């Protein structure tokens, strides 16, 4: 009963401070973004090579393109990655310490290089540090001599049902001036995201001639100002596939998997493109739109096994990340996620997934809680219906990439679509406790804290548990 009262007060307070409605259906925003006349070629749209955000750090063999992600299942590990021009002694070492201790520790990473067409990468270092203390600020140092560089990160709180935590949400960002605006906008948001859930499509280097992998390097330097200090949880998108038989590249995901590791083995996954983590009060499952997912496939078998491990008494918020949206009312990529929806949606509903975040479509859209699990080829019930056990689907592929906005929408707006707008921006998912979380979407043209769309979410699992408790009283 106490949890019910706390949850209701949280909801009432949220409505007073931010008077938004629950799932207002059918809104197509009237806001029209002033176009920067997106051009067809990445060379014409991406920031110039000599942009200050692409600057190479000074010093001999200086570490660059520094980024971190969660390094284990529970949140006590971090993977630190960086590149150096040369594989010199000391280049592969991380020195780290907590702000509460003067004792410094050292860890050694692994080093890899890869080739892609006529490009050979720099030396790419990955160092996994485990057994860190929860909810603690750590500093870490890379490099040596005049090339030393220092960064920091904060580990998440220990997983627990009422642990508050704030996630930033970014997708399909690329490296245009709009991309820079999106990242700046996120950094300035007073909500202060503690980690980023990234919905895929990083550098868009494949839009350059021969998939110019130098654009992976510029993107790594551009994003470092955020991802070196807070973990980004990676989802692979179609622009990470890099399958290009016309230039002799037959192995997919080569640049992405060499540069951006994930803690997939910690969740029993045999592939870095799908995995799961626990972070504070959230259990996050990352799926791959561009890997096999039909019944009996490795991803399918892993996914169904992972769902059985979710403990909603420990991590009540069940979140799924997948690049291609399963519900999408834009003309761009319309119904591309339909096959995956048919396979996975029954599990989303049965296990009461709270929210599914996607990218791919270069605009913003939020759905009602709907499902289409009743459909089969015999009964032809192919219209989504309201379903309180279903997740909210949010498409946030509006990071600012060189392909521009997806502005053409299907008409009329389908009943499952609650809000849609063709603008660049980012999102915030703010978990308050086991029962309530607040989602907000922030378009780049507004002040960083202005909410162009927002929604209070009632946890699917605990809502049903509380309802059962109330009915039994």
UniProtKB/Swiss-Prot annotation:
Cofactor: Fe cation; Mn(2+); Zn(2+); Cu(2+)
The keyword Chaperone belongs to this UniProt entry's keyword annotation: no
Catalytic activity: a phosphate monoester + H2O = an alcohol + phosphate
Chain residues that bind Mn(2+): 201, 238, 323, 360
Keywords, in A-Z order: Disulfide bond, Glycoprotein, Hydrolase, Iron, Metal-binding, Secreted, Signal, Zinc
Superkingdom assignment: Eukaryota
Residues given in the record as substrate binding sites: 238, 360-362
Catalytic residues (positions): 333 (proton donor)
Cross-referenced Pfam families: Metallophos, Metallophos_C, Pur_ac_phosph_N
Position of the signal peptide: 1-38
Glycosylated residue positions: 118, 180, 311, 433
UniProt-listed Enzyme Commission number(s): 3.1.3.2
Root EC class: hydrolase
Description of pH dependence: Optimum pH is 4.5.
Main location group: secreted
Entry GO CC: extracellular region
SUBUNIT field: Homodimer; disulfide-linked.
Name recorded for this polypeptide: Purple acid phosphatase 1
Organism annotation: Ipomoea batatas (Sweet potato)
């Amino acid at each position: 009963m106490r949890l019910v009262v706390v949850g209701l007060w949280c909801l009432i307070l949220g409505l007073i401070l931010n008077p938004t409605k629950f799932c207002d259906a059918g809104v197509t925003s009237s806001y029209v973004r002033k176009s920067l006349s997106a051009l067809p070629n990445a060379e014409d749209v991406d920031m110039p090579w000599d942009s200050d955000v692409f600057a190479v750090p000074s010093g001999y063999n200086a570490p660059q393109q520094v980024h971190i992600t969660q390094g284990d299942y529970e949140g006590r590990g971090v993977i630190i990655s960086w590149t150096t021009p040369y594989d010199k002694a000391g280049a592969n070492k991380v020195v780290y310490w907590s702000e509460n201790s003067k004792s410094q520790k050292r860890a050694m990473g692994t080093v890899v290089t890869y080739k892609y067409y006529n490009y050979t990468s720099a030396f790419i270092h990955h160092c996994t540090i485990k057994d860190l203390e929860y909810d603690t600020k750590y500093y870490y140092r890379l490099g040596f001599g005049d090339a030393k560089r220092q960064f920091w990160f904060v580990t998440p709180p220990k997983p627990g049902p009422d642990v508050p935590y704030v996630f930033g949400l970014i997708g399909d960002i690329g490296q245009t001036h709009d991309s820079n605006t999106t990242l700046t906008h996120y950094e300035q948001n007073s909500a202060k995201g503690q980690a980023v859930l990234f919905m895929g499509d990083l550098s868009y280097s494949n839009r350059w001639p021969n998939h110019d992998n130098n654009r992976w390097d510029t993107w790594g330097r551009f994003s470092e100002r955020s991802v070196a200090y807070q973990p980004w949880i990676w989802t692979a998108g179609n622009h990470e596939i890099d399958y290009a038989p016309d230039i002799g590249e037959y192995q997919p995901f080569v640049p992405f998997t060499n540069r951006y590791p994930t803690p997939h083995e910690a969740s029993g996954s045999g592939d870095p493109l799908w995995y799961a983590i626990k972070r504070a009060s959230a259990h996050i499952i990352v799926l791959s739109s561009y890997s096999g997912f039909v019944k009996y496939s490795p991803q399918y078998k892993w996914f169904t096994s992972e769902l059985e491990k979710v403990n909603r008494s420990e991590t009540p918020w069940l979140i799924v990340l997948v690049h291609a949206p399963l519900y999408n009312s834009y003309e761009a990529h319309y119904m591309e996620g339909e096959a995956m929806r048919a396979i996975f949606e029954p599990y989303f509903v049965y296990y009461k997934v709270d929210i599914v975040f996607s990218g791919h479509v270069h605009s913003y859209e939020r759905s009602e809680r709907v499902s289409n699990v009743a459909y089969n080829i015999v009964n032809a019930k192919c219209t989504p219906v309201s379903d309180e056990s279903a997740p909210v689907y949010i498409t946030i592929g509006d990071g600012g990439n060189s392909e521009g906005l997806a502005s053409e929408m299907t008409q009329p707006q389908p009943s499952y679509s609650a809000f849609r707008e063709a603008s660049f921006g980012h999102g915030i998912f703010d978990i308050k406790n086991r029962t309530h979380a607040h989602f907000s979407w922030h378009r780049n043209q507004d002040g960083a804290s202005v909410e162009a769309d927002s929604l209070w979410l009632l946890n699917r699992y605990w809502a049903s548990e509380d309802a059962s408790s109330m009915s039994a009283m």
